Amino acid sequence: MATAFFMQGLDATIVNVALPSMAQSLQQNPLQMQSVIIAYLLTVAALIPVSGWIAERYGTRRIFAGAIVLFTIGSLLCGISDSLVFLVLSRILQGIGGALMVPVGRLVILRSYPREQLVKVMGFVTLPALLGPLVGPTLGGWLVQALSWHWIFLINIPIGIVGYYFAGKFTPNFQREEHQHFDLLGFVLFSGAMVAISMSLEGLADLHMGSVPVVLLLLVGCALLCIYWLRAISIEEPLFSPSLFKIRTFTVGILGNIFARLGNGALPFLIPLKLQVGLGYSPIKTGLTMIPLTLAAMAAKPIVQPILTRLGYRRTLVINTVLLGIMIMGLGFIGPSTPEVIILIQLAILGLINSLQFTSMNTLTLIDLKEDNAAGGNSMLAVVMQLSIGMGVASSAALLDGFSGSVSPDNTQIMHAFFATFLCVGGIAILAAFIFFQLHAGDGRVRARKKKTA
């Protein structure tokens, strides 16, 4: 599981660094290279909704190992690509594997361990996932400079081989004995909605689409979602059952994830941009400055369980979400005169809070799911995580652009634009605290208590 999570996290950050080099090598306009990113993201958005059904139908071991193989073969094909078309097609294959790896891996954990151990196990398994984004930009820059852009993909091959070996040897094979009906129309509606919404977010953040196509894509996505849920209420076996939202911890976890990730999802975009554009850091120095954030997040994993045991999910998430928003706002106050040690301390504290936030949110969302709805609930969480992070980047890019106006990047007023953007993003994150306040004091502890009294 950890190997797959690491590959996914590494790929999310390493590719962007190499786009200019790819464009030069493939003799393409750099602006056209965004299709390399979009092909992967749209494939993942389209297939995540069906990951749970596929895993239950064909077995978690087979699908998880197969997903690693697809991702690895896709990486190999990307690494030997000699044209943009071949590279985009290879990224689609890589995206098919990526859409299944993490959701199915998390489903295996959910099925394998008692709920009272979920926080501890999830914290351990996601540690390598934190390493991926940490080393991605720096490793990508070094590979492009020292070797070539091809190696940002080829580096996945040995990792994938190791992951496949361990997946086949140690992954339990959970599979439904009775064949569950596949809701094909529901899949088309829901996946179509995910693709349309993802495309609108990419258009807003990276493709510089006009407002009309962005709004139209967003409306189409929302309309498809409405049609899906209206239909799901009236059929027997929908792709995602509306009954999932009768589980309070799941509903609160999903809604809280949306708002918290809307704020937090902007940080991988905003922080490096501010350090380089606002403070004049080099890409290498920016990567090194981000290290305390990830190291602190890793160091916080062992203390998440004791905090949740002591305070419970409700108090932990309400307090921590407010702190998260305040820390995001605090990044807006960083300026050219801010001592570097203060910046490093701020990022380290943010990393600690982040780690507690997302481990708590994710386990809260999954902790009360039963055997018959675990796959659907887990896939729904994966969909929300994918979309809300994209929404965070798109909304922060739009805010920064709006506050900047016609100001050139070297103008001192750009710092005011960053300041206003961080305040807004932090405020969005704080809104999640009101959602987590709807939890009951004992939520998240029920299963453990039942087992102890059994």
Named regions from a protein language model:
Residues 1, 64, 71, 87, ...:
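Hydrophobic alpha-helix/TM-entry signal in multi-pass membrane transporters
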Residues 25-26, 31, 56-57, 79-82, ...:
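Membrane-helix boundary and inter-helical linker elements of multi-pass secondary transporters
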